[in-house]
């Protein structure tokens, strides 16, 4: 088994799609990378703050090591979160590959207006609702460079269709790193 890194901007449907993907397997794990940040009790820096780089590297490495451990034990594993190539993809990929586990990467894409509307419907930290923060994070997914082939346009799809699109690309080997 390998690890699927499922990414995209806030509000694109990552958590819902990851949950649906987990339902497709007898033994599956869905790790929400964001939850690993909650373990920091003192000294936490919001992950989108430029000063959080070192913290983000540590947290994402730990999340990736956890994902790799589950995959090595035979679980179909999805590590879901905001994983941007120039921010944290490298450290995540290195940790998973160091465990000898195959890794795949999928980026869900939808219009920023649709993602922002979904975020506004949520309850939670008001900082992530800041339109400037949302726009800055979403812009990071506009040009993925060498990882552009890992993008999946989910505009107009419901969650089930998006999960099926990811599963098809994953099974076809198109998302492997």
Regions found by a protein language model. Give the residues of each.
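Conserved substrate/cofactor phosphate-moiety recognition/catalytic segment
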Residues: 19-68
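Conserved phosphate-donor/acceptor-positioning beta-strand/loop module used by diverse small-molecule
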Residues: 99-120, 152
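Glycine-rich phosphate-binding loop used to anchor ATP phosphates in small-molecule kinases
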Residues: 55-99
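Small-molecule kinase domains that catalyze NTP-dependent phosphoryl transfer to phosphate-bearing small molecules
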Residues: 121-165, 177
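Hydrophobic anchor at the beta1->P-loop junction of P-loop NTPases
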Residues: 6
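Walker A/P-loop
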Residues: 15
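ATP-binding Walker
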Residues: 12
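P-loop (Walker A) phosphate-binding loop of NTP-binding proteins
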Residues: 9
């Amino acid at each position: 088994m390998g690890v699927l890194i499922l990414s995209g901007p806030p509000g694109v449907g990552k958590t819902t799609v990851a949950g649906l993907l987990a339902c497709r397997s007898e033994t599956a794990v869905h790790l929400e990378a964001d939850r690993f940040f909650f373990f920091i009790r003192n000294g936490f820096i919001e992950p989108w703050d430029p000063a959080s780089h070192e913290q983000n590297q540590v947290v994402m490495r730990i999340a990736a090591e956890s994902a790799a451990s589950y995959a090595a034990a035979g679980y179909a594993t999805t590590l879901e979160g905001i994983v941007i190539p120039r921010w944290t993809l490298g450290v995540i990929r290195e940790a998973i590959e160091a465990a000898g586990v195959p890794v795949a990467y999928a980026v869900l894409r939808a219009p920023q207006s649709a993602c922002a509307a979904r975020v506004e419907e949520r309850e939670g930290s008001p900082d992530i609702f800041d339109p400037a923060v949302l726009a800055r994070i979403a812009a990071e997914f506009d040009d993925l460079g060498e990882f552009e082939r890992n993008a999946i346009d989910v505009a107009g799809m419901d969650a089930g269709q998006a999960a099926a699109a990811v599963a098809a690309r994953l099974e076809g080997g198109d998302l492997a790193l």
